[in-house]
UniProtKB/Swiss-Prot annotation:
Name under which the protein is recorded: Uncharacterized protein C2F7.02c
The FCP1 homology domain, residue ranges: 153-311
SMART domains assigned to the protein according to its UniProt record, in alphabetical order: CPDc
Molecular function (Gene Ontology), one example: RNA polymerase II CTD heptapeptide repeat S5 phosphatase activity
PROSITE patterns tied to this protein: FCP1
Region called Disordered, residue ranges: 37-85
SUPFAM superfamilies in the cross-refs: HAD-like
Length: 325
């Protein structure tokens, strides 16, 4: 009996190759679409090149942070807000309304504070303390700038503005082990210890940045807390100026750091801050960084060094940092 071979029907499509199948699967995954019996192959769209090596990370963080914006109101807050989505703690929350303290109250409040700092939980019954009057901000020159004229040794350098809390350090009123150092501050006539942990790489970061930039620490924390912390942190004496809460603008309940008030050229000004609401006036001059609490494997400060070395040489930092969302 003579064997016959079945001829493929002219209407039948050619079986796709392995690479065609793989490409089709990838396309369907990215497009969130299921593959039919006759898959359709869509060519990949050209991707616009990111303007900097950290641009993808900057975009994702900005989008995540923009989902919620923190406000700064209520009782006095000694620390700066730990993250955009969380309200900062108050050291006064461990002091009873009549100005007295006891160990049990402090322990209970300490538990609440630690939970509040790390998880953004609001106290169920917040204690109402009036904010103290902030000191008058010292101004310089005819423009009433926040900073004095640039020093001779910093001429030709760009200005690097650094946030403090959750950017360079994490501070807690509750016991932290191990703490890098402890500062004592006075609240209503009583001394309270604040334990401070340094972000990994902060010493190397500050030393290298001091060679390339005029460094300014600009924090929304109170000076009575931030000043002693910076005294302990700045081993290399590279921080030229310190600005505190009174130098911030209060815009819709947020402490905003207005770079146009510093007295430095904007094209030469860069701010690194974990809170996007701090730089809402100048987002194209910002390098976002994640909020840091206790991850000792964090390397973001070290990772930023080569990028900032490049940024120190560009004519206008906004041409690199400007996000095209």
């Amino acid at each position: 009996m003579k064997s016959t071979k079945t001829q493929p029907s002219p209407e039948r499509e050619r079986e796709p190759s392995f690479f065609q199948k793989l490409f089709g699967n990838l396309c369907s995954c990215f497009q969130d679409a299921s593959i039919d019996e006759k898959p359709t192959y869509t060519p990949a769209k050209p991707v616009k090149k990111a303007p900097s090596v950290v641009q993808p990370r900057r975009v994702s963080r900005t989008l995540r942070s923009s989902e919620s914006v923190h406000t700064n109101h209520g009782p006095e807050r000694v620390f700066e807000s730990p993250t955009p989505a969380r309200t900062s703690i108050s050291l006064e929350s461990a002091i009873s309304p009549n100005g007295t303290t006891n160990e049990q109250d402090i322990a209970q409040q300490g538990d609440m504070i630690d939970s509040h700092v790390h998880f953004g939980e609001q106290p169920t019954e917040p204690i109402d303390f009036a904010d103290p009057p902030l000191p008058e901000v010292k101004r310089y020159g005819e423009g009433n700038w926040l900073l004095p004229p640039i020093a001779k040794e910093d001429e030709g350098k760009k200005c690097l503005i650094l946030d403090l809390d959750e950017t360079l350090v994490h501070s807690s009123f509750k016991y932290i082990e191990p703490a890098d150092f402890v500062v004592s501050i006075e609240i209503d006539g009583l001394q309270h210890d604040v334990r401070v942990v340094k972000r990994p790489g902060v010493d190397e970061f500050l030393k290298k940045m001091g060679d390339m930039f005029e460094i300014v620490v600009f924090t929304a924390s109170l000076a009575k807390y931030a000043d002693p912390v910076l005294d302990m942190l700045d081993h290399s004496h590279v921080i030229r100026h310190r600005l505190f809460r009174e130098a911030c603008c209060n815009y819709e309940g947020n402490f905003v750091k207005d770079l146009s008030q510093l007295g430095r050229n904007l094209e030469d000004s860069i701010i690194i801050d974990n809170s996007p609401s701090s730089y809402i006036f100048h987002p194209s001059h910002a390098v976002p960084i994640s909020s840091w609490f206790n991850d000792m494997h964090d390397m973001e400060l070290i990772d930023l060094i080569p990028f900032l070395e490049h940024l120190a040489r560009v004519p206008d930092v906004s041409t690199v940092l400007n996000l095209q969302l």
